[in-house]
Amino acid sequence: AMRVEMGAPITMSRNAQTDAALGHLESFIDALEKLQDRVTLANGDVMVREPIGVCGLITPWNWPVNQIVLKVLPALATGCTCVLKPSEHTPISAMIYAEIIDEAGYPPGVFNLINGEGPIVGSAMSQHHDIQMMSFTGSVRGGTAVTRDAAQTVKRVTLELGGKSPNLVFADCNLEERILASVAECMYNTGQSCDAPTRLLVEKSCYDEVLKIAKQAADNIAVGNPEDEGPHIGPLFDEIQ
């Protein structure tokens, strides 16, 4: 589905996107095994953990399966119900996930899937009186809108927003090792990740050498057909990117 929806190479989709989702699943299982409903604090007070209620979940297009698992699983595992709105650009992965949830035997209404454009559906979810919490992954502009709309009903909000993550490069490091790793990480998923190190802040004395290594590394990145196996990257998602 990711190959068709966003042009992610089949190898990367299987080995990174799907593998990351499985990693989240294993981590949540470990956490749940240790989770206690009642915890006695050092001062004698008792902390009681209870389900929040209905959670509104908005996921992005760039890591669709990973983000769906990251939001839906902990909500359901802790006794919450949820409404998932995937990116309108990558709805197929969410639809497949909904089928899996249904086949697993979850009662109707525990997991709900709604599709539509972010500014319209996302705003309606964020303002809805029956949703107690919003979780959003996407742009800073989108996160700002969710926070503003959720404030009308004093919802809890969690955000994971995109940015321009810098790498600091000093002259005394192993320049080739560091720059090759930075360029590879930046180009991963065709540069379409929230944590892509899209900036290098370089010490002036090694600037020319860093530029040379970075250019060579970028030139060596292969772009290929998403249907083909291999370490190449795929196309950009759309013209805006």
Regions found by a protein language model. Name each.
Residues A1-M6, A20, L32, S205:
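N-terminal alpha-helical segment of soluble enzymes
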Residues A1-V4, D37-L41, S193-D195, P226-G230:
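Short coil/turn segments at secondary-structure boundaries
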Residues R3, R14, E26, S126-Q127, ...:
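Alpha-helix boundary recognition
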Residues A8-Q17, D45, L113-N115:
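Short loop-beta-helix segment that forms the pyridoxal 5′-phosphate
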Residues I10-L35, Q241:
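Long amphipathic alpha-helix in the N-terminal Rossmann-like dinucleotide-binding domain
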Residues D37-E177, G230:
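Rossmann-like NAD(P) dinucleotide-binding subdomain of oxidoreductase/dehydrogenase enzymes
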Residues M133, R141-Q241:
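ALDH superfamily catalytic-core signature
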